[in-house]
């Protein structure tokens, strides 16, 4: 089996290697000598979770909304929003694919939650969590995705959680690799929001089909209930996770009068992303309290385009 380190050595020869860390806020486009965009923009389904959960937005309209309302041709699904309809397989998944194909929209990944702790201290529970994700690997493969996003949840001390999470991820990654699907971990609370910890997990797994999905905002170190009390530096965290990144989430909440995100300096953050050699999709993930979901998506897209172009 080719390890992740061997894979990266081979990939280094074709990496763009453009450094933008020293560029000014208005200079991101200056490092691009061609007409190819520095990065492409996708839409994460979580941006529409309120509308979908209320029934105002039919789940099957996701690809249509991305393309027709925003001109976005790549999408990222969230299993919470359709697992009750599909179970991760069957006719519903086929219908999702048919609609996306008809709209000319790429399905990039499925964000998976609620399937157990991949780093559970109990071996049987950990094994069950690994197997619970198999259906999503299969659904992702059918949809034409490159990855499923998972959580590296565990319990215990720092080092023990690292070993347990790496074990569960390694097992799931072996299954993903057989289906040519990547297993990618998002900073999503607890130790997974510690960039040093999660990068350490990646080194332990050491597999080209296992990587990260850095999110600009999810760097709270506590639980969902106490988030906001202790935060990891978001810029450091993204920098630590980018060497393993196979997708990126542009989290947004609120915007100032200039159209900039209030919590995250998008110019600074995207310099970090681009300096790592990343040229893939950056997914809009709006979850703010002020703008509507549609307006929030539009504002985030406009900001990303302003940074890029």
Identify the residue ranges that each predicted region occupies.
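Structural motif corresponding to the early beta-alpha repeats
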Residues: 72-170, 177-182, 208, 218, ...
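Acidic/histidine-rich catalytic cores of soluble enzymes
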Residues: 74-75, 170-271
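N-terminal export signals
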Residues: 8-28
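C-terminal segment of N-terminal export signals and the immediately downstream linker at the start
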Residues: 23-53
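C-terminal helical cap(s) of enzyme catalytic domains, especially alpha/beta-barrels
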Residues: 294-309
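Conserved, mostly hydrophobic/aromatic
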Residues: 43, 66, 100, 140, ...
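Short, acidic/polar
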Residues: 53-68, 127-138, 230-238, 266
């Amino acid at each position: 089996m080719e390890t992740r380190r061997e894979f990266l050595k081979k990939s280094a020869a074709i990496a763009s290697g453009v450094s933008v860390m020293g560029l000014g806020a208005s200079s991101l486009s200056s490092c691009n000598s061609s007409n190819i965009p520095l990065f492409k923009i996708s839409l994460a389904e979580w941006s529409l979770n309120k509308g979908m959960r209320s029934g105002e937005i039919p789940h099957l309209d996701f690809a249509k909304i991305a393309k027709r309302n925003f001109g976005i041709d790549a999408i990222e699904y969230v299993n919470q929003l359709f697992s009750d309809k599909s179970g991760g397989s069957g006719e519903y998944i086929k219908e999702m694919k048919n609609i996306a194909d008809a709209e000319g929209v790429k399905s990039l990944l499925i964000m998976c939650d609620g399937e157990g702790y991949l780093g559970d201290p109990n071996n049987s529970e950990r094994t069950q969590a690994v197997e619970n994700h198999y259906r999503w690997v299969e659904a992702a493969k059918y949809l034409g995705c490159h990855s499923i996003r998972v959580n590296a949840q565990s319990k215990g001390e720092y080092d023990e959680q690292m070993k347990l999470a790496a074990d569960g991820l390694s097992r799931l990654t072996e299954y993903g690799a057989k289906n040519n699907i990547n297993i990618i971990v998002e900073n999503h609370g607890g130790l997974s929001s510690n960039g040093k910890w999660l990068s350490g997990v990646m080194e332990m797994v050491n597999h080209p089909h296992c990587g990260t999905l850095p999110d600009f905002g999810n760097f709270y170190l506590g639980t969902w209930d106490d988030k906001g009390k202790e935060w990891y530096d978001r810029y450091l965290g993204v920098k630590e996770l980018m060497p393993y990144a196979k997708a990126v989430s542009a989290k947004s909440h609120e915007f100032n009068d200039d159209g900039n995100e209030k919590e995250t300096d998008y110019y600074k953050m995207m310099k970090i992303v681009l300096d790592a050699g990343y040229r893939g999709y950056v997914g809009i993930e709006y979850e703010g309290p002020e703008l509507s979901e549609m307006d929030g998506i539009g504002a985030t897209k406009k900001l990303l385009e302003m940074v890029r172009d």
